[in-house]
From Swiss-Prot:
One biological process term in Gene Ontology: rRNA base methylation
The organism's taxonomic lineage, starting at the top: Bacteria, Bacillati, Bacillota, Bacilli, Bacillales
Protein's job: Specifically methylates the N4 position of cytidine in position 1402 (C1402) of 16S rRNA.
Source organism (scientific name): Lysinibacillus sphaericus (strain C3-41)
HAMAP family recorded: 16SrRNA_methyltr_H (MF_01007)
Family: Belongs to the methyltransferase superfamily. RsmH family.
Protein name: Ribosomal RNA small subunit methyltransferase H
Keyword Transmembrane assigned: no
GO molecular function ontology, one term from the record: rRNA (cytosine-N4-)-methyltransferase activity
Length: 316
């Protein structure tokens, strides 16, 4: 079973200000925790559209959401194609969209998926198992300079060059095939003093490779921009992020869309096309309560941001 403890459940869904007759999108179906709580609040006129690029998640969600299946549409797709998929399914605008970014617990806990540095498994890390690029290709075929770039940019790893050099040296003699082999090379590349603090030494490198394999930041940016366009005025977007790169991206997009541009002095009235598109519902991100962290330690880095659309200037 795709067993996953849902993070910030009520805060995320309640933040959407659910209209029972509305149309809502869960861009990251996963274990269907958010979807189940949301669909329970919908009337027979309401609709929930669930995206996931992992077919296992969709198949399991169909079982979990069986009592409400008449209100649910499942879309097997990366959420970066949010706009085109919604339009293809006949939805021109929706009333709310939620995102729970990052890897779901079942993906982490299934060794053969290759996401976890705690299990020895083939280097994979694909969220969409039909995709072609895997962690094996990144680790064994990408140039030293490209490895340094992703380790530093996506993993914020101070020892990016040292780790990339260890990988480059090791793969000359034989391919690096497993997560266990990669973990050992990472440990060799990071000085002992640095390894003793800041959690598992492989955490940042694995994050960087995972983001590169799945183009997570590019997909999130594309999707969030489309989400702003696709929601009705009064509709909301809830986004849970799990690391600073995701949160920074989300914060930047929302800040830009909720800010006034530079205006000429003494302008008597602000034209509609210059007014902000969004209003920030959460000035500062919502974080899990102590009670939630007691039962789900994986939620410790989660941050929730919620915005509301107040101007439809972007639509034709």
């Amino acid at each position: 079973m795709f067993d996953h403890t849902t993070v910030l459940l009520k805060e995320t869904v309640d933040g959407l200000n659910i209209d029972p007759d509305g149309v809502y999108v869960d861009c990251t179906l996963g274990g269907a925790g958010h979807s189940e709580y949301l669909v329970q609040q919908l009337s027979d006129k309401g609709r929930l559209i669930c995206f996931d690029q992992d077919m296992t998640a969709i198949e399991n969600a169909k079982i979990r959401l069986a009592p409400y299946i008449e209100r649910v549409t499942f879309i097997h797709s990366n959420f970066r194609y949010l706009k085109e998929e919604l339009l293809a399914h006949g939805f021109e605008q929706v009333d709310g969209i939620l995102y729970d970014l990052g890897v779901s617990s079942p993906q982490l806990d299934t060794p053969e998926r290759g996401f976890s540095y705690h299990h020895d498994a083939p280097l994979d890390m694909r969220m969409d198992q039909t995709a072609t690029l895997t962690a094996f290709e990144v680790v064994n075929q990408w140039a030293y300079e490209d490895l340094v770039r992703i380790f530093f940019r996506y993993g914020e790893e101070k020892f990016s060059k040292q780790v990339a050099r260890k990988i480059e040296e090791a793969r000359k003699s034989a391919p690096i095939e497993t997560t266990g082999q990669l973990v050992e090379l990472i440990k060799e590349g990071i000085p002992a003093a640095a390894r003793r603090k800041g959690g598992h030494p492989a955490k940042r490198i694995f994050q960087a490779i995972r983001i590169a394999v799945n183009d997570e930041l590019g997909a999130a940016e594309d999707s969030l921009v489309d989400a702003i366009d696709m929601i009705n005025v009064g509709g909301r977007i809830s986004v849970i992020t799990f690391h600073s790169l995701e949160d920074r991206l989300c914060k930047t997009i929302f800040k830009e869309a909720s800010s006034l541009p530079e205006l000429p002095p003494n302008l008597p009235v602000i034209p509609d096309d210059m007014k902000p598109t969004l209003k920030l519902i959460t000035r500062k991100p919502i974080v899990p309560s102590d009670e939630e962290l007691e039962v789900n330690n994986r939620a410790r880095s989660a941050k929730l941001r919620v915005v509301e659309k107040i101007n439809d200037k972007g639509r034709e």
